[in-house]
């Protein structure tokens, strides 16, 4: 049998690696997987999954940016605009611990690095994702539900600094599903919600 066309087409549709959300970042990167149906679907799922995970985590553990540079006690300088925990607006678990526990944790890195500034203040510096290091990404296969929260649900950030229930945060969690700003594919620029 010399008909190898069907095998070749199946391999092309499957692709040669996993589709990632970075493949959907631009028309150029999308060109690397275009025509590989399975990789396209995997990349779109990665976009959806990571957006949901980051949205939920950002509500439980909101970030803000520093307005000025600061230096840590070990001599490292952090520029203005460094992303840190928004301590004033974050919820806490019943133990009041900072930083609060994120719902989904990455397998290779904590959400924050605790840094003591030369000004005596404690900063919780957000550890950004590195697209080249999979264990730092919020992606399928590189995250898990926070084990502390699985063991003791009361550690979930649901309380204000004064100990009262943070109902506003609950409203933000519900509203996150209605935000219409996600684009799954560079060729489909119509924004959608998590539910669409």
What are these model-derived regions, one by one?
Residues 1-196:
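Structural signature of extracellular appendage/secretion-system components
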């Amino acid at each position: 049998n010399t008909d190898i066309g069907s095998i070749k087409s199946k391999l092309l549709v499957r692709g040669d690696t996993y589709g990632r959300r970075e493949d959907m970042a631009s028309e150029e990167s999308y060109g690397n997987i275009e025509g590989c149906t399975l990789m396209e679907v995997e990349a779109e799922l990665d976009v959806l999954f990571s957006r949901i995970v980051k949205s939920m985590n950002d509500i439980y553990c909101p970030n803000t940016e520093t307005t000025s540079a600061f230096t840590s006690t070990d001599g490292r300088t952090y520029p203005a605009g460094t992303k840190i925990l928004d301590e004033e607006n974050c919820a806490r678990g019943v133990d009041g611990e900072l930083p609060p526990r994120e719902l989904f944790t990455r397998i290779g890195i904590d959400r924050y690095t605790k840094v003591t500034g030369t000004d005596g203040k404690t900063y919780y510096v957000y550890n950004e994702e590195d697209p080249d290091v999979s264990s730092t990404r919020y992606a399928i296969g590189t995250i898990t539900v926070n084990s502390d929260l699985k063991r003791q649900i009361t550690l979930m950030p649901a309380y204000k600094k004064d100990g009262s229930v943070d109902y506003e945060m609950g409203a933000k969690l519900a509203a996150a599903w209605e935000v219409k700003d996600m684009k799954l594919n560079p060729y489909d620029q119509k924004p959608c919600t998590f539910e669409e």
